[in-house]
Amino acid sequence: MFILLLAVPSRAQVVGKMFPAMEAQTAEDKVVKLPQDVQGKYTLLGLAYSKKSEDELNSWFEPVFSKFIQKTQGLMAGFGYDVNVYFIPMFTGINAAATGTAKKKAIKNVDPQLLPYILFYKGELKPYKEALDFEKRDIPYFFVLDPKGKILFATSGAYSESKMDKVEAVIE
C-alpha cells in the first residue's frame, strides 16, 4: 500500500505557492509577464515542454475554448467565465532555437480565435521544473491561479471531463 502511494503523481506540493515569474510572448511578439499581467482574475495555464506533451496540451484547446473563452449567446449570455487562459509551449535548451518557427507554424495552423491564448516561452526550464514539480517530460501541466497569482489547483496530462470539472469547481 505504501509503495502504491509513492507511485501516484501528486501536484499537491505546488498548491498554495505563488506561480513563478515567467516572461512569454504571443504569436505577435507581445510580451506577457506571468503572473503579474494576469492579476485581478482567475487564470488557467497549460504548460508543455516536449513535442509529445504539446500534443496532449492540444487536447485541452477545444474544451477550454468552449468553456472559458467563447462568449455565450442567447439565454446563457452573461453566464460565461471571466478568466485568463493561456496555453504555453516551452522552448528550452536546444529547442529554444525553434521558437520562431513554432510561432509561424501556429499562426498558419491554429484557429485564429485561439491564437491570442497561446504564449511562447523561450528560456530556462530548471526554475519551472523545480517550482512547479514537473515530474514527466511527456505530459502537459495545468495550473489554476487565484487573482493574486497563487496556485489553487494543479493537474497534468491529457484532457478529461473529470479534470475539467475540478478546474471549473476551483474557478467558480
Question: Which functions belong to the PLM regions below?
Answer:
Residues 1-7:
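Bacterial N-terminal signal peptides
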Residues 51-53, 91-95, 125-126, 151, ...:
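Solvent-exposed loop/turn segments at secondary-structure junctions
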Residues 53-111:
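Structural microenvironment flanking redox-active thiols in thiol-disulfide oxidoreductases
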Residues 94-138:
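Thioredoxin-like thiol-disulfide oxidoreductase module
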Residues 37-61:
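Short active-site neighborhood of thiol/selenol oxidoreductases, capturing the structured segment around
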Residues 22-42:
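A short beta-strand-turn-helix
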